[in-house]
Amino acid sequence: SVVAAYMV
């Protein structure tokens, strides 16, 4: 998901 990719 987009949220998981942003939480790097």
Curated annotation (Swiss-Prot):
What keywords were assigned to this record? Chloroplast, Plastid, Thylakoid
Q: Any other noteworthy remark?
A: On the 2D-gel the determined pI of this protein is: 6.7, its MW is: 16.8 kDa.
**Name of the protein in question:** Unknown protein from spot 105 of 2D-PAGE of thylakoid
Q: Which residues cross the membrane?
A: none
Where does it live in the cell?
Plastid, Chloroplast thylakoid
Q: Mind telling me which GO cellular component terms the entry cites?
A: chloroplast thylakoid
Tell me the organism.
Pisum sativum
Which lineage is the organism of this entry classified under, starting from the top rank?
Eukaryota, Viridiplantae, Streptophyta, Embryophyta, Tracheophyta
Query: What is the superkingdom listed in this entry's lineage?
Result: Eukaryota
